[in-house]
UniProtKB/Swiss-Prot annotation:
Name recorded for this polypeptide: ATP-dependent 6-phosphofructokinase
Keyword list, A-Z: Allosteric enzyme, ATP-binding, Cytoplasm, Glycolysis, Kinase, Magnesium, Metal-binding, Nucleotide-binding, Transferase
Subunit structure: Homotetramer.
InterPro entries membership: ATP_PFK, ATP_PFK_prok-type, PFKA_ATP_prok, Phosphofructokinase_CS, Phosphofructokinase_dom, PKF_sf
Binding, ADP: R21, A22, V23, T24, R25, R156, G187, A188, E189, R213, K215, K216, H217
Chain residues that bind ATP: G11, R72, C73, G102, D103, G104, S105
Catalytic activity: beta-D-fructose 6-phosphate + ATP = beta-D-fructose 1,6-bisphosphate + ADP + H(+)
Known EC number: 2.7.1.11
Length: 322
């Protein structure tokens, strides 16, 4: 293994830069040349590939976003398009590709490994949604969680001052981990998740019970994958006469300097990805399970159609929100 490339793809997440830094410095330490692919898979097509040096990743571990940039590239699903991307790697003698991103990014890496046996591919889970199989946590999840906690703590101040119910919508299309972990952390009165069939009438009854006990305000945490915050508010007011406000946190969840936990996770996974390439591994995603570094074949990651839902944590959140 003499040359590798690294790219970031899909939605950005805090800690991607730390992962690129770890890949780059681990490779250089092992006398491997590193190339950065700018603009994700689109950069592979456009030949936007440039050599990275130690200085290229200096002063990046604390930066949010990705200095390699990211872009959606739906045309990468086409075989002719992928051939062009593979040729751009081949002509530089690149033997390994590290892809940092989510499920769609992994699928692109798998295609490359299938269609070009001389190019090894390793995926690193980078998404705030924490929805990738093969790992307990994805890069960016912890930072996004802390961003939500900080925001909702401030929202609760104004909710308390005006005796209002705030519906807070957070990211999470298919996986409600952000809503679940944040809801437990901020003491939300109710958490609405895509993994759980929630009757809004029950939510209204719970809020009403709290009002009867003297509670003046409530926080309802909603993952975007099951309904919008506004839809939740509209449904609630059909059953109970309360003053509601909706707060959609949106892309603020993706930004900001990565937390210490995300910097460490990204560094560990980035270094491990290079080690796997050195060992001749390919078509695998790296991860962390029980604080141990692991690797899982892409086929197995895709076969697990549903991540294991933490029902125990959900039940605890319900018990603590009485």
């Amino acid at each position: 293994m003499k040359k590798i490339a690294v790219l970031t793809s899909g939605g950005d997440s805090p800690g991607m830069n730390a992962a690129v830094r770890a890949v780059t410095r681990t490779a250089i330490y092992n006398n491997i040349e590193v190339y950065g692919v700018y603009q994700g898979y689109q950069g592979l097509l456009d030949d936007d590939i440039h050599k990275l040096e130690l200085g290229s990743v200096g002063d990046t571990i604390q930066r949010g976003g990705t200095f390699l940039f990211s872009a959606r590239c739906p045309q990468f699903k086409e075989e002719d398009v992928r051939k062009k991307a593979i040729e751009n790697l081949r002509k530089r003698g690149i033997e390994g590709l590290v892809v940092i991103g989510g499920d769609g990014s992994y699928r692109g890496a798998q295609r490359i490994s299938e269609e070009c046996k001389e190019i090894q591919t390793i995926g690193i889970p980078g998404t705030i949604d924490n929805d990738i199989n093969g790992t307990d946590f994805t890069i960016g999840f912890d930072t996004a969680l802390n961003t939500i906690i900080e925001s909702v703590d401030k929202i609760r101040d104004t909710a308390s001052s005006h005796a209002r119910t705030f519906i807070v919508e957070v990211m999470g299309r298919d996986c409600g981990d952000l809503a679940l972990w944040a809801g437990l952390s901020v003491g939300a009165e109710t958490i609405v998740l895509p993994e759980v069939n929630t009757d809004i009438k029950d939510v209204a009854e719970k809020i009403e019970q709290g009002i009867k006990r003297g509670k003046k305000h409530s926080i309802v945490m909603v993952a975007e994958g099951c309904m919008s915050g506004q839809e939740c508010a509209d449904e609630l007011t059909k059953y109970i006469n309360i003053d509601t406000r909706v707060s959609v946190l949106g892309h603020i969840q993706r930004g900001g300097s990565p937390s210490g936990a995300d910097r460490v996770l990204a560094s560990r996974l980035g270094g491990y990805a290079v080690e796997l390439l050195k060992q001749g591994e390919t078509a695998k995603g790296v991860g962390i399970r029980n604080n141990q570094l692991t690797s899982t074949p892409f086929d197995e990651i895709f076969a697990e159609s549903d991540r294991k839902f933490n029902s125990q944590m959900y039940e605890l959140a319900k018990e603590l929100s009485i």
